[in-house]
C-alpha cells in the first residue's frame, strides 16, 4: 500500500512539473491561473493521500464500557476537588491561550495550528479514554465533560468546538462503540495525538430534524456504505475519522467513516464558528462501520451532544457577562459609569439569572445521564432554554456596548455570531 502511494505521489509531482514548465502557458497567458489551480489541486490531492496512509488496524482489546456513577442519589451542585482543579486549569487555558488566539482565528476563518500542541499538552483526550487503554476515565464523567466544555468556552466558542471534536468522538466510541469499532480506533487515539475526528451530523435542510435524515446507509455483504450530504462539519477538511448520522432500515443510526477519495469536501464558512473551519461533506458510497450494537441509544446520543453545545453556550455567556460588567464600569456618560443606569444594570443582572438557570438545567440533565437514569426530558428543556437565553444574552451584550458592540474592536459581536449555533446544531459533540 505504501509503495503504491509513493508511486502515485511521484507520478503526480512529475506531471505537475511538466505542466508548469510548458511554454504554451505563457503564449496563452494562462500561467498564473494554471499555477494557482495546480497548487490547490495538488494540495488537496496530497492531503487525501496522506490521510489514506494512516492505518487503522484492529487490535485485540476487550469491549470497554464505563460504569455509571454509583453514588448519585441526590442532585449535588458542589464540585469534587478533581472537578474544581480541572475547571481551574481549563479556565486558565481559555483565558491565556484561547482568548488571545480567537480574534485572528475568526478573522482568517482558520483553526490555529499551535492549538494542536496545546491539546496534546493538556492531555484532554485522555479524559475520555478508559483506564484500560491508558486513559484516566474509570466511570461515566458526563458532568466533568460538561464542566470542561463550559470552562473552555469562556475563551472562545469556535475554538472550543474544534478542540472538543476528537475528545467527543472518543467519548462516543467509549460509550457506544462495538468491539470492532473500539478495537480499531481507540488504541490509535491513545497512541497518536495527530489523529483527529469529528461529527458529520447536520444536513442542508430547513428546520433540520435529527430523526428524519436524508443521508442513507446501505448494507451489502456485511459492509455498510454511506450516501448523502452533511454540512457545518467542524474541522471537516482536516479530520481523519467521521461519525456520520444516516438512516438505515428506516431508523436513524451512527456510522464510523474514514476520510477517503469517496468523500467530496468543500469549505463552507458560516455566520459563526468561523475558527472551527466548518465544511460540507458529500458521501458517495463511502465504506463505513456501524458505531454501536445492542446497547446503542440514538436519542441519548443526540441529547449528550446537545448538552455539550449548551455547556459551551453557558461558558460564552459568562464571558459576555464579565466583559459587559467591565465595560459598563469603565464607560462613562453624563459624568458617571453607565453601570449606574438601571437599564444597563438590570440587563446585566438578567444575564446572571439566566446563566444560573441554564447551568442548573444542564447539570441536572448531565447528572441524571451520569447515573444511568432517563434524562431526555431534562436535556430537551435545557436545550430550549439555552437556545433562547444565550441569544438574548448575546444580543444584550452587543446592546450594552452600543455602537462599539457592532464592531470587531470588541469580542461581543463574535460571541453573538457563535452563540447562534446553539439553537441550530444538533449533536456534533458528545459529553
PLM segments and residue spans:
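Glycine-rich beta->alpha junctions and the first turn(s) of the following alpha-helix
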Residues: 79, 154, 265-356, 422
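A short core secondary-structure module
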Residues: 227-264
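A structural signal for short hydrophobic beta-strand segments in well-ordered beta-sheet cores
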Residues: 215-218
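Internal helix-loop-helix
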Residues: 56-63, 91, 121-193, 235-238, ...
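Short, contiguous pre-domain boundary segments
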Residues: 63-79
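A short, Trp-centered hydrophobic/proline-enriched beta-strand micro-motif
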Residues: 192-202
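C-terminal helix-coil-helix/basic helical segment that borders enzyme active sites and/or dimer interfaces
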Residues: 102-107, 333-336, 352-385, 398-403
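Glycine-rich phosphate/cofactor-binding loops in nucleotide/flavin-utilizing enzymes
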Residues: 1-65, 148, 168, 401-431
Amino acid at each position: 500500500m505504501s509503495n503504491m502511494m509513493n508511486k502515485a505521489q511521484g507520478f503526480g509531482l512529475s506531471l505537475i512539473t511538466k505542466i508548469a514548465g510548458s511554454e504554451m502557458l505563457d503564449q496563452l497567458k494562462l500561467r498564473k491561473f494554471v499555477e494557482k489551480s495546480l497548487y490547490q489541486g495538488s494540495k488537496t490531492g496530497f492531503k487525501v493521500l496522506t490521510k489514506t496512509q494512516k492505518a487503522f488496524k484492529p487490535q485485540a482489546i476487550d469491549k470497554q464500557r464505563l460504569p455509571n456513577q454509583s453514588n448519585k442519589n441526590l442532585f449535588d451542585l458542589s464540585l469534587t476537588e478533581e472537578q474544581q482543579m480541572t475547571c481551574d486549569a481549563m479556565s486558565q487555558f481559555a483565558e491565556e491561550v484561547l482568548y488571545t488566539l480567537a480574534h485572528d482565528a475568526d478573522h482568517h476563518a482558520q483553526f490555529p495550528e499551535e492549538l494542536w500542541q496545546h491539546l496534546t499538552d493538556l492531555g484532554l483526550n485522555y479524559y475520555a479514554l478508559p483506564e484500560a487503554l491508558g486513559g484516566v476515565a474509570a466511570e461515566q464523567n458526563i458532568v466533568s465533560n460538561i464542566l470542561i466544555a463550559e470552562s473552555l468556552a469562556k475563551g472562545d466558542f469556535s475554538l472550543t468546538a474544534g478542540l472538543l471534536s476528537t475528545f467527543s468522538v472518543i467519548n462516543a466510541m467509549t460509550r457506544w462503540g462495538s468491539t470492532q469499532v473500539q478495537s480499531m480506533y481507540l488504541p490509535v487515539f491513545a497512541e497518536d495525538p495527530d489523529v483527529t475526528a469529528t461529527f458529520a451530523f447536520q444536513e442542508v435542510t430547513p428546520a433540520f430534524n435529527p430523526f428524519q435524515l436524508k443521508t442513507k446507509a446501505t448494507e451489502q455483504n456485511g459492509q455498510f456504505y454511506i450516501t448523502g450530504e452533511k454540512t457545518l462539519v467542524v474541522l471537516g477538511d482536516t479530520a481523519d475519522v467521521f461519525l456520520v448520522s444516516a438512516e438505515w432500515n428506516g431508523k436513524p443510526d451512527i456510522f464510523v467513516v474514514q476520510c477517503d477519495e469517496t468523500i467530496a469536501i468543500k469549505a463552507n464558512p458560516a455566520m459563526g464558528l468561523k475558527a472551527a473551519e466548518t465544511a460540507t461533506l458529500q458521501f458517495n458510497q463511502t465504506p463505513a462501520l456501524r458505531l454501536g450494537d445492542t446497547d446503542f441509544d440514538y436519542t441519548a446520543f443526540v441529547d449528550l451532544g446537545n448538552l455539550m453545545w449548551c455547556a459551551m453556550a453557558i461558558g460564552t455567556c459568562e464571558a459576555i457577562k464579565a466583559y459587559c460588567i467591565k465595560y459598563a464600569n469603565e464607560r462613562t456618560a453624563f459624568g458617571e459609569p453607565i453601570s449606574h443606569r438601571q437599564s444597563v444594570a438590570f440587563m446585566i443582572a438578567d444575564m446572571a439569572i439566566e446563566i444560573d438557570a441554564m447551568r442548573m438545567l444542564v447539570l441536572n440533565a448531565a447528572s441524571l445521564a451520569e447515573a444511568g437514569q432517563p434524562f431526555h426530558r431534562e436535556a430537551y428543556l435545557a436545550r430550549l432554554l439555552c437556545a433562547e437565553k444565550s441569544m438574548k444574552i448575546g444580543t444584550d451584550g452587543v446592546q450594552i456596548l452600543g455602537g462599539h458592540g457592532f464592531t470587531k474592536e470588541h469580542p461581543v459581536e463574535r460571541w453573538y455570531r457563535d452563540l447562534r449555533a446553539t439553537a441550530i446544531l444538533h449533536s456534533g459533540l458528545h459529553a
